[in-house]
Swiss-Prot record:
It is found in: Cell inner membrane. It is a multi-pass membrane protein. The keyword RNA-binding does not apply. This is Glucans biosynthesis glucosyltransferase H. Its main location: membrane. Involved in the biosynthesis of osmoregulated periplasmic glucans (OPGs). InterPro entries: Glucans_biosynth_gluTrFase_H (IPR023725), Glyco_trans_2-like (IPR001173), Glycosyltr_2/OpgH_subfam (IPR050321), Nucleotide-diphossugar_trans (IPR029044). Gene3D superfamilies: Spore Coat Polysaccharide Biosynthesis Protein SpsA, Chain A. It holds the Pfam family Glyco_trans_2_3. The gene is opgH. Its EC number is 2.4.1.-. The lineage of its organism: Bacteria, Pseudomonadati, Pseudomonadota, Gammaproteobacteria, Vibrionales. Pathway: Glycan metabolism; osmoregulated periplasmic glucan (OPG) biosynthesis.
């Protein structure tokens, strides 16, 4: 197959330069110990950043009230025979874990009633006089996915009357030279389709400092001043044009709005694991998300993508500092989104969650292993927030968001410690002879007893609170006859819900141990790195599964053996948490299987409305991706570039310009090594064999070096001839 760029003799990029002229602006790093001058700003509208206090009192107060009741009941369970040290430990761990689930419970109550009584959102249609830059950051992602999605969304948006108000930017941090060249080939194809219809641009950084946050900050400092808003997407995001327009209109109509976050629906799940996440997020997620939006109001949060941000607020208030010390707790802030939202709110702009907006989509990890890889990075970023939670001037709700993020991973060690403490308590009662008469004189013995009836009642209450978001979401769905019919009827919906609950219960203990391992490794100073995500196929060879789950199986066997030492009854009680660990290898393989996922899809089990009636924008993006896959079969590689002067010119036209360098400034090691290797090379062939992937990626991003390489003979044989 002939490369279309070579076949057409491409030497120029259709639609003009790869990036527009720069419009520089300041984005100062924020001081976490003091507020910048002029912050918090005064609201423009009356009540522009004020929220209803009674909503917080209801949700947080109710969570504290039921937590106090549960803790009192648990204390009553042990108080019958007096509290021992292990019982004190169980009580403390129970209190921490119960408070965590109680807040989600009270939030879901609010979400349930809001959704049950929701009316259609008011029409905010208005002409757009503001400019919005739509940003698609990418890092070693499959170019066919990214560029097909951008092309589809850009052309769909261009067909509306508001298309002129948006420009598109693919911001690449790709380090793999093959992927980088494939991105350029895809961008050339993209420009063929969008030139004259939509403004689409591409920039690849030579050095991905500060990862995604640094990528967007670089755009802001160089081009951000030309736009009123930034609509940030992710590499797997798709958004309907109407949703983008609504976000821009809401931002335009509210001068105090700093950030508006949508609640993305999960789509395109092909494996069983992806389908479980997709179903849960679609059926139960809106209950929690809507409840959260209802009570946090103007102190919402940012989840990193599928959100619109006021450029002025972001550039003036959300420049992230470099934390002192080494990773994992020092260095660049990894989970930047929570921090950026907190800083924007600190500066006096509102941060809201648009729970009423549909048409926002993303994808999810296809397997337990991919979840573990993603969560390892997120865990490090969230634990790093312990360095930020004390930042001066943060709203208490922003601090609560940071705490929630930390607890989403610390809760796993707390749950594990609670299980181990309870098991130890049972083993102590079974094997250790009780001290009926303590050192303190008493006429009556001290009997080690517990109120078992009270304990059982508390267990049922805890389970009810834990499963309440699922129950509320299912109830709302069951009362929606039209949606139930779409999903195959109420019986099929119930079957899907039962399947999701069972599979989630089996996977939960595995994820608990994965999170525990992540927390421990972070506390020991291990950095997560930055690996690209797998988004389609989640399968792994059985050998890899055995290796990755070896400790989970071992832990399950040891816990089961310890429970059996006490009694078969205790083992039976613990079996729901142990079965997933015992069978973690087959469970991981089955849930990552595309074939098994396809069977569930065929039977409409774990189906979602977006799967049955797929939005037009999603179908169009999928179809266009298939075409990109064909067009990119012959990847534009370094040898092809160097062999054709037209491709060299086109490649240089797509490069990010070299920053100005002051004489006497230090040369970076990578730059120095790459320059020396290029200068000493006798041919292109010998140089390409000598360069590492990182060095080749750097050379391909440096116009001076690539021109120097182009002057070399292709091989030593050519030189002698």
């Amino acid at each position: 197959m002939t490369n279309p760029m070579v076949e057409q003799g491409a030497s120029q990029l259709m639609g003009g330069s790869a990036m527009p002229p720069e419009q520089h602006g300041e984005m100062p790093e924020q001081n976490l110990k003091r507020l910048s001058e002029g912050f918090p700003r005064d609201a423009i509208q009356t009540g522009g950043v004020k929220s209803c206090s009674w909503r917080r009192v209801f949700v947080v107060g109710f969570a504290l009230l039921i937590s106090a009741f549960a803790i009192f009941e648990m204390r009553g369970v042990f108080l019958v025979g007096g509290l021992t040290p292990i019982e004190y430990a169980v009580l403390v761990l129970f209190a921490i874990n119960f408070c965590w689930i109680a807040l989600a419970f009270s939030s879901s109550i609010a979400g349930f009633f809001v959704l049950a009584s929701r009316k259609p959102a008011p029409n905010t249609e208005q002409p757009l006089t503001t400019r919005t830059a739509i940003l698609m950051p990418t890092y070693n992602e499959a170019p066919d996915r990214v560029f097909a999605a951008v092309e589809t969304m850009a052309l769909a948006l261009a067909k509306t009357e508001h298309g002129h108000a948006f420009d598109w930017f693919i911001l690449s941090d790709t380090t793999d030279p093959e992927v980088a060249l494939s991105e350029e080939q895809a961008f050339w194809l993209l420009r063929q389709q969008t030139a004259g219809k939509a403004n689409v641009y591409y920039r690849r950084r030579r050095k991905n400092i500060a990862r995604k946050a640094g990528n967007i900050a670089d755009f802001c400092r160089r081009w951000g001043s030309g736009y009123d808003h930034l609509l940030v997407l992710d590499a797997d995001s798709v958004m309907q044009p109407s949703t983008m327009i609504s976000l821009a209109q809401r931002m335009q109509s509210d001068p105090d709005a700093g950030l508006i976050q949508t609640i993305p629906a999960l789509i395109n799940g092909t494996t069983l694991m992806a389908r479980v996440q997709q179903f849960a997020a679609r059926i139960y997620g809106p209950v929690v998300g809507t409840g959260l939006a209802w009570w946090v109001q103007k102190e919402g949060n940012f989840w990193g993508h599928n959100a619109i941000i006021r450029t002025e607020a972001f550039m003036s208030a959300a420049g992230l500092p470099h934390l002192s010390g080494r990773p994992p707790f020092g260095g660049h802030i990894l989970s930047h989104d929570f921090v950026e939202a907190a800083l924007i709110r600190r500066a006096g702009w509102s941060v809201t969650i648009a729970a009423d907006l549909s048409g926002s989509f993303e994808e999810c990890p296809p397997s337990i292993i991919d979840l573990a890889v993603r969560d390892r990075r997120w865990c490090q970023g969230n634990l790093q927030h312990s360095r930020i939670i004390g930042t001066k001037g943060l709203h208490w709700i922003s601090r609560l968001h940071l705490t929630t993020g930390i607890m989403s991973y610390l809760s796993s060690p707390f749950w594990l410690l609670l299980i181990l403490s309870g098991l130890l308590l049972a083993l102590q009662a079974h094997f250790i002879r009780p001290e009926y008469f303590t050192e303190q004189f008493s006429l009556f013995p001290t009997w080690p007893v517990m109120d078992s009836a009270r304990a059982l009642q508390l267990f049922y209450i805890t389970m009810g609170i834990l499963f309440s978001p699922k129950i509320f979401g299912l109830l709302l769905l069951m009362f929606d006859g039209e949606m139930c019919r779409t999903l195959g009827g109420r019986l099929r919906v119930i079957l899907s819900a039962v399947t999701e609950i069972l599979l989630s219960a089996l996977v939960a203990p595995i994820m608990m141990l994965i999170h525990c391992g992540a927390v421990v490794s972070i506390l020991f100073g291990r950095d997560s790195g930055w690996a690209p995500q797998r988004r389609d196929d989640g399968s792994l060879p059985i050998k890899d599964l055995l290796y990755r789950h070896r400790w989970h199986m071992t832990a399950g066997v040891l816990l089961g053996y310890a429970a059996m030492l006490d009694s078969w009854t205790l083992l039976a009680w613990m079996s729901p948490a142990l079965i997933g660990l015992w069978f973690s290898v087959p469970l991981s393989g089955i849930t990552a299987s595309y074939t098994i996922g396809a069977w569930f899809k065929q039977k409409r089990i774990l189906a979602t409305p977006e799967e049955i009636e797929t939005p037009a924008i999603v179908l169009a993006a999928q179809a266009r991706r298939d075409e990109y896959v064909v067009d990119l079969q012959e990847v534009w590689n370094a040898r092809m570039v160097l062999a054709d002067h037209n491709l060299i010119a086109l490649h240089i036209a797509m490069m990010d310009k070299l920053p100005s360098r002051q004489p006497g400034t230090a040369i970076e090691p990578l730059d120095a090594v790459a320059r020396i290797k290029v200068q000493e090379a006798e041919s292109q062939e010998s140089l390409l064999a000598l360069l590492t992937k990182v060095e080749l990626s750097y050379v391909l991003g440096n116009p001076l070096l690539i021109q120097q390489v182009a002057k070399l003979p292709p091989s030593l044989a050519n030189q002698t001839v």
